[in-house]
Amino acid sequence: MRRLVLAIVILLGINISNIWAGNSSSNSSNVRYVKAPRFARPLLEKWISEYSKTQPGIEFQIAKGGQDDIDLNVVFDNQGVNTEGFSRAVVYFGEFAVLPITASGSEAAKVLEGKHLNSKKLKQLYFLNDDFDEDVKKIKQFEKLVIYSGSNATSVTSSFAHNFGEESSNFRGKRISGDDLFLTTALAKDPLGVSFNALPNIFDLKSRHIKSNLSIIGIDVKKSLESSFSDNATLDDLIGVLEEGKVQEVAVEKIGVSYNQADDAVNQFLQWVLTAGVKYNHEFGLLNLDNKLAQVQIDKVKNILTAQK
């Protein structure tokens, strides 16, 4: 009798363990992990929060630093090779802009004060190049300034460089590892430091004004636009100007989501992003795509959903 009771207890224990394991597997399969550069994470967090209200059964989370099980990867248009096993199937949801900056009140800011640098002069300031155009007078003051650029794979360094026809390996100065926020940290420590960054890292997203410790380096734009590229600019004014037309001295690049496996949950999330999530782009410092390109992205996801039915 005791043996029979013991056998029943063991069988019950095995069954309960299997149920728990099954539930655990089911729960983990409902989580999708998204990897993103830090400047885009506040937008991703907003998306995840809002999407969970419409689809509570599917959970999206921001991936941690060294995490391997990634379902979605936020990438830039210039990242044209497969990374971390992800395909080049990319759905673009917006654009980001990169501006030249220095620390407010620094010696570098004083050197650059009142200057309106065009593309050729910006190349001279930021890059190692002895083959500058002959019509560009060499500015000796630039030589004492220290350029800080990023070396991280998610840095906007390559976007800034490509806008001037340069490679990221051709920057003068020092390379900073880690997130691009460390570029502004470097400026705070070096009075001669000069760098660049994406708008969400330059502006306070709540006040919509430039962060008090930073200063935008003057660029050569039409007089009517000068205030939009000054330290008195608001984030929304600047975004509006950049959406109206390209400014040669400002790097603007598409940002999108690359995915490894496009299951129903991922595709439905992407469809929501393109139809509802993009309304938060401006709030978090990103530009919207033009209407034609935005529609192309919506159609792309719709076609994938249709093909899977």
Question: Residue locations for each model-derived region?
Answer:
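Bacterial Sec-dependent N-terminal signal peptides
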Residues: 1-31
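Flexible loop residues that form catalytic
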Residues: 9, 78, 199-200
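Exported/periplasmic ABC-transporter solute-binding proteins
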Residues: 20-55, 63-67, 89, 101-309
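N-terminal pre-domains immediately preceding structured catalytic cores
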Residues: 58-62, 73-75
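Short beta-strand-centered segments that line the small-molecule binding cleft or hinge
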Residues: 69-96
